[in-house]
Every structure is written in structure tokens, then in C-alpha cells.
Amino acid sequence: MTNWRWWICSLLFVATTVNYLDRQVLSLTYKEFIAPEFHWTDADYGTITSLFSIFYAIACLFAGKFVDWMGTKKGYLIAIGVWSLGAVLHAGCGVATTWFVDGVDSVEALRAVEAGSNIALTVSTVSVYLFLLCRGILALGEAGNFPAAIKTTAEYFPKKDRAFATSIFNAGASVGALAAPLLIPPLAKHFGWEMAFIIIGGLGFIWMFFWQFMYDKPEKSKHVNQEELAYIHQDDEKTVIPSEASESPATEEKAIPMLQCFAYKQTWSFAIGKFLTDGVWWFFLFWAPAYFQDQFNAPASSPLGQGLIFTLYAIVTVISLFGGYLPKLFVEKKGMHPYNGRMLAMLIFAFFPLVALAAQPLGAMSPWWPAILIGLAGAGHQAWSANIFSTVGDMFPKSTIASITGIGAMAGGIGSMIIQKVAGNLFTYAEGQGAAFHFMGFEGKPAGYFIMFCFCGLAYLMAWILMKSLVPKYKPVEVK
């Protein structure tokens, strides 16, 4: 039997890695390079990350339908092309800011502007809008990644293998976040933050070449033999395997209209699970570098800062790979239904983020404790994420998977928008109040971080309870 499906899975892994590298450039250059140049506060950064989330959420609603309409191959190509362009455009924000601010005629002059002056406020405001434009383009393209990847997984893998395949490509998020602190801060330090955006953004254009020549539907791919095709279609009640001589249009499934998708509890179960938990991962992704610099004076470009961020995402990467293996074990060894095995695995993984509650208390002993504990919490999220994505394939026909995934990603983006905005305003307020702001023994900004860690720790158990309440038993959607 050929194993072309795993080569396709590796492409999904690389795309997701590039996706998260592009998303991480701003968070790893914000505190040390961009904030001083454009006079940003945490509230400004929170505004950018929260609006990126809402741009992403809105785009996700249509991205799934777009991928279903365009097809996996073209849809994925367009998505990664758009987000790579958006990533590269960030590099021009400094020059563009000088065009709109009187008295500032060069990028070098931006740093020389007196902090707190009217010109500094203008620089901050103009640059925030320019970055938002670039983040909007980035979000528009990135929204297509997971709908296209999940649709590809449903095309190339039987149900019992989908969570494992999803955990592999979803690990790209962890690997991207893992590689980011090793690549991006040194690039920004030695060549400028603009070059970091250009080099990392350019990786997506390279990926497009491989996708163009390697991907095709399994029924049409010359790299997939009949034995592998039969394995892929083992779940079909009536599997029609097209031969080289004929292809039956009867194998096409009827898609569910977008508005009708909202009539199913299965859609709401998936959407609520994403709404409550996606923002936790994005909080770790966007704020971990700033957290280590604020709390431990460890900038992302310093050896300590790089070590802390690398350790965090190394833990995420290694442990999250078991996210897809555990339900596979339940199905093959315990004889459980794939959906029931997934829900049991998700319950187990929902307990992992609780360790984030100890990040701030143990941080008083060593900065390595928060790195380890946030890493464990992030690993729990990635393992959870691999399985929640796969529940869509359990419940919905393949023709609608990208649309449902887009709805869930939209819900996750809305949840993330709320968390990022709350975090940015909370940190700015807590820093300004100092000792007057306190929570559970912490004062000022550390108290703000502890509040956020408390929510992150509890979000997954709340999500699992609500999901199980909506869909207590396996019940696939029937298209009439």
C-alpha cells in the first residue's frame, strides 16, 4: 500500500508551521523593537491583537465556504498567498507612518520623538492603523488554513486516523511557535524587525510551489494506489473507488447551506468549544514574550528570553503529539466509537491547563516554572484542539466540513478578540495603578497576569461540560 496521505499530511504540517511563524513575528518584536519605535502601550498592542482576532473570526466564517467552493487545492493556494503577502507588508509600516506624520521624515526619526508628546501620540495612532491593515490581510489569508487542512484530512484519512493526522499537522502550530524565538528575534536584532517580517513571510510563497505539484484528490492522485484508496474510504457505507477509466459523479455529497448549519446542536457544540478555548492559546502566543520581559526582564532577543520561550513551546510540541494518539488508543484497544474516544480524551486534556494557576506563584522562585507550566497548559490546548477539530469529521459530511470548521474558527476568533482586548487593557490599567491593584496576593501587573492565568486554567473544563450537554451522544448530521 502506498502512503501518500502522510506526505500530504506533512505539507499540512509545514503550512501550519509557516502560519504560526507569520503570526508570531509581531509578538516577538513588539516589546523590544516595535513598541519603542512607535510609542505603543500594552493597550495599543491589545487593540491590534484583539482586532486581528475579530478580522480572523469574520474571515473564518467565509473561509470554510470559500474552500468548499474553490476546492481544496485552489482554496489553500489562495489562502497562503494572501497571508504571506499580508505578512510581508508589515515591513512597510514604518516608512508609511512617516508619510502621514508631519515633522517625522525618516524611520530613524520615529525613535527620536519625545515620549508622551503630541507627535508621539500621532505616531502611535497612525502606526496602529497601518499595522491593523496588514493584520487584516494576514487574518484574511490565515483564516483559510484550518478549514483547508481539515478538509484535506477528511479527504485523505479514515475517521479512526483523523485525530492522529490532525495532531500531526496541528503540531505545526507548536513547532512554528517553537522555532519563532530562535529565528525572529535574531533576525530583528541583526537586520531590523522589517526584515524579520519579509523573510518569514516569504516562506509561504515557497510552500505554494510544493502544494501545486504534490496535492490532488486521492481518487485522482497518481501517487495513491487502489489499496491505499480503499483504506482511505473504509468508513464509507458505499465506497465507489474510481478506476482510471471512469469516475462516478454519484460519489459527490450534498453540501449543507451555511445558514442551515446553525440549526444543528453539533455546530453549536463545536463553536462553543472553540469560543472558550482558542483565545487561551492565542493569549499564550501573543503575550508570553511580553510576560517574560515584564516579569523577569528577559527580552525575546536575550539568551534567557529565548530559552524560556523555547522551553515553553518544546513542551507543547512534544506532549501535544499524544493528543491524536490517545483517542486512537481508545478506539483500537478499548473498542470505543471514535467520537466517544475523542470526548474522553478531551476531558483528560481539559485538566492540563489547570497547571497555569500555579505559574505566577511559582514564578517567584524561578522564571523557568512559568515556562514549564504554561508549556503544559499549551500542550493541553493543542491536544484538545486536534480532537475538537476531528469531531467535525465525525458529525458532518465531507462536503460541509470546511464550512463548519470555518464557523468554529470564527467563534474561536471572537473569543480570542475578547481575551486579547481584556488582557491589553487590564495590563495597562494594572501597571498604572501599581500597588492599588491587587488580586490573590499579587499587586500591579503581576496581579493582571494572574487573573488571566486563572481564566486560561478553567476554560477547557467549562467548554467540555457545555459541549457534552449539547451533544451527549454520537449523532451525525443527516443531509436530506
Describe the role of every protein-language-model region:
Residues 24, 53-61, 143, 177-178, ...:
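Residue-level signature of mid-helix packing/kink "hotspots" within the transmembrane helices
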Residues 26-30, 262-324, 381-385, 389, ...:
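Extracytoplasmic gate region of multi-pass secondary transporters
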Residues 76, 131, 343-346:
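Primarily marks hydrophobic transmembrane alpha-helices of the MFS/SLC 12-helix fold
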Residues 81-124, 347-364:
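C-terminal ends and interior cores of transmembrane alpha-helices
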Residues 134-174:
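Cytoplasmic helix-loop-helix junction between adjacent transmembrane helices
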Residues 173-222:
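Helix-loop-helix hairpin linking two adjacent transmembrane segments in secondary transporters
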Residues 207-215, 354-362, 449-480:
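Multi-pass alpha-helical transporter architecture, strongest
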Residues 339-387:
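C-terminal transmembrane helical hairpin of 12-TM major facilitator-type secondary transporters
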